[in-house]
Amino acid sequence: MSEKKINLLDLDRKGLRALFTEMGEKPFRADQLMKWIYHFGVSDFDEMNNINKALRAKLNARCEIVAPEISSFQKSEDGTIKFAINVGQGQEVETVYIPEDDRATLCVSSQVGCALECTFCSTAQQGFNRNLTVSEIIGQVWRVADFIGFVKETGERPITNVVMMGMGEPLLNLKNVIPAMDIMLDDFGFSLSKRRVTVSTSGVVPALDKLGDALDVALAVSIHAPNDELRDVLVPVNKKYPLEEFLGGIRRYIAKSNANRGRVTVEYVMLDHINDSTDQAHELAKLMKDTPCKINLIPFNPYPGSPYGRSSNSRIDRFSKVLMEYGLTVIVRKTRGDDIDAACGQLAGDIRDRTKRLAKKRMQDSQISVTIN
């Protein structure tokens, strides 16, 4: 049996340099290779004309450049494109491309499903199968960039921002998320500014501390409730890492980070008559008073079987005005791609659930309804 080839998309620059050294080659060859892969979108070693023929033969024998394939895509009326990405064994994750006048953002998945059980999120209802590998994470960026079109003459890439806000909790897959983000930031990789790469978390505090020690990228935090009682229901990881502990981790991250410019983005999904009252707005403002932040209010995006509804524009407006009375910066997120189920909280993919989440959910639906009313 032939030896399995090394997928070079699984290696950041440090890993590639180590591989080239082990092959008896100069480490700078790794830099050349990365430029071909990430600047020009080349996956065929024989097209890399500044790499000598002997080294190309070695690479062909031992290595490969393989990104997961796009199974299908849907385009929204607003230009948003949702991609189904095949990660093997009949499973798919979803990746969303959001073009705007001054930027093009890609929302990337980190897991097949999600191990957390946020009750308003479609991904969470599908259960969890496994973590994505480095090549499956960075491969989403590479594959979509290839679909939209690398400008091979200049090395210009069609993606300016990446947000780790797709399927999964990124901080539960740090082993692979950190090297993937390293490649996004690397000058020989996708060469994105650290302020243009954002990782989102629901509050896995020990992993947040580890991330802060390893990497400096923008941070978005999923709060969604102004107190522990409600957050225990909406974001059950709160039972393990309650709000005060989470806020402490956020403040420690901000203290280490330059990418956040001294403040963090707070994500708060607006659920009709659940977390959107003016009293809850006052409570949220007081909760966040010692944490430098801007607050992103996200109108809830319904999905089939969801127990929640979207807050009305008038309730969102009142909630926003209360927060601004406290001097907080507030943004109401514009919904993108909801007509193709590509908006925040709607990603589902195709998952072989290892947690039996769907069966358990059916038993719990009525209990959740009683708890939140």
From Swiss-Prot:
Alphabetical list of PANTHER family matching this protein: 23S RRNA METHYLTRANSFERASE, RADICAL SAM CORE DOMAIN-CONTAINING PROTEIN
UniProt gene name: rlmN
Matches recorded under NCBIfam families: PRK11194.1, rRNA_mod_RlmN
Protein name: Dual-specificity RNA methyltransferase RlmN
Active-site residues annotated for this sequence: E94 (proton acceptor), C344 (s-methylcysteine intermediate)
Biological process per Gene Ontology, one example term: tRNA methylation
Domain of life: Bacteria
Domain Radical SAM core: 100-339
